[in-house]
Amino acid sequence: MLEQVDKAAEVSDDDLRRSFTTFRMELDLDMPPDPHSERYRTAVMDLYAWLHGSPYELSNESTDFELGRFVDVPFPYSTASGVTVGNHLMAIGQVIRTLDLAAGSRVLEFGAGWGNITVALAQMGHRVTAIDISQQFADLIQARASRVNATVDTMVGDFSMVDELSDSFDAILFFESFHHCTDHSSLLTSLHRIIAPGGRVLFAAEPIEEDFYAPWSLRLDGESLWAIRKNGWFELGFRTSYFMDALGRSGWSAAKVVCPGLPAADIWVARRAG
């Protein structure tokens, strides 16, 4: 199956994404009853090891690419796909519109990747810190920001860097990144330390679904299986009721902001409860 996907990728990004829809996996999993328990988390990690072929390593999340090639033409523009580019721009616009930040706000983006939102917010005059596991992504963000005379503070590390930060932020953003966290409960709790009074945490374009097959677990659609098996990425999905419960247990309340015409770009906005 991976061979067929790779062949589709050689044709175009659209063909690659169409190939993802041709397969998925259905599993009858006997998961521990308490989704907040360490036993449950261990079961998810065991499922990952079975799907990927070896236990999870944080280094799997790092992306290797040729920096110079993507400074001027980063993802999604590099795909040359009208659908992919259009959807991505819609999702980014939804984030910026939902944030609606006051001038000069402090923003932290976890898993900033290609830097599309980070650089856009920096161009708007916000003070942006971008954290990513990949040094190459950090270098790319700096190069892209420099091209537009914007300033971004980049840091290389994983989600655990939340415990090393000394600043507070008006907004903390996860865009297609929260679902890569192997210990999301601890992360949600730790965010309180760095959120400014009245600040918000945004979970944007994250796989949070009413009818997800488990409270939380690895996604079993074609694209996720490909990403787990080939790249070793951690690809979680969340049932809405579980996600809301996890937020509540961590001291957050949240509301959903729907993206018209693109459900995959819906946003959950969390604030301190009470």
Predicted stretch roles:
Residues 185-197:
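A short glycine-rich, Lys/Arg-flanked "PGG" loop and its adjoining helix->strand segment in the class I
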Residues 1-92, 217-230, 267-269:
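N-terminal accessory regions of S-adenosyl-L-methionine
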Residues 204-260:
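C-terminal alpha-helical "lid/dimerization" subdomain adjacent to the S-adenosyl-L-methionine
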Residues 113:
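Conserved glycine-rich SAM-binding loop
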Residues 163-172:
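A short acidic, Gly/Pro-enriched loop at the edge of an enzyme's catalytic core
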Residues 110:
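Conserved beta-strand/loop positions that form the S-adenosyl-L-methionine
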Residues 171-183:
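A short SAM/SAH-binding and catalytic strip from SAM-dependent methyltransferases
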Residues 116-161:
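Class I SAM-dependent methyltransferase SAM/SAH-binding core
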